[in-house]
């Protein structure tokens, strides 16, 4: 973690820049694609799970869809941020020249197209524990074997055949994207066995 305090590391007209007080964690790009958000999109948040307190979490808006987060944050963003103790009021989207009193810049624990650092497990453990604590006791009973469908996967034209084979083996076929994030966590926590192809659906495991 590069800890930058009382240093100006920018070029430009400081008179026109905004100034942010307090301790700020720079978290990289705010990914709106689900699979990228729960992988490299969370990979700079590990100081939070190490019990370091921050006043704000600063993101760069991704090139596509930044306004959609401001106007209507996706359900999974809200759920995961809440699980990490981050309120939406703490999130800053950097759209203009900005100075910080204290800025923490962690190296990504999961760089894109690379291996994940073990500290990512601490982030996912927080999400898992929050999910379990959010569910009623009767919702934690063991359930079916699940096959996670990839109905929108254009790389396969035999999805119905694959799904039929899993149904014959006693699996319940589900398309997780049809459920709220909390409901997805409930289904996965209930499952005896989960099967599927590599992709966003299995990232939840």
Tell me the role of every PLM-derived stretch.
Residues 1-204:
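The feature primarily captures lumenal catalytic ectodomains
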């Amino acid at each position: 973690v590069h800890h930058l305090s009382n240093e100006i590391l920018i070029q430009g007209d400081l008179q026109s820049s905004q100034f942010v007080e307090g301790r700020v964690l720079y978290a990289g790009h705010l990914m709106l694609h689900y699979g990228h958000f729960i992988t490299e999109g969370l990979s700079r948040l590990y100081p939070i799970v190490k019990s370091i307190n921050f006043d704000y979490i600063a993101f760069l808006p991704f090139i596509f869809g930044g306004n959609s987060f401001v106007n209507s944050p996706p359900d999974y963003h809200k759920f995961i941020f809440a699980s990490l103790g981050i309120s939406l009021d703490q999130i800053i989207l950097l759209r203009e020249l900005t100075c910080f009193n204290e800025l923490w810049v962690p190296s990504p624990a999961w760089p894109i197209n690379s291996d994940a650092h073990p500290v990512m497990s601490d982030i996912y453990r927080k999400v898992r524990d929050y999910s379990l604590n959010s569910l009623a006791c009767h919702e934690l009973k063991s359930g079916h074997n699940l096959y996670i469908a990839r109905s929108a996967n254009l790389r396969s034209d035999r999805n119905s055949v694959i799904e039929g084979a899993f149904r014959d083996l006693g699996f319940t076929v589900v398309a997780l994207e049809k459920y709220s994030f909390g409901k997805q966590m409930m289904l996965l926590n209930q499952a005896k066995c989960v099967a599927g192809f590599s992709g966003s659906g299995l990232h939840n495991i």
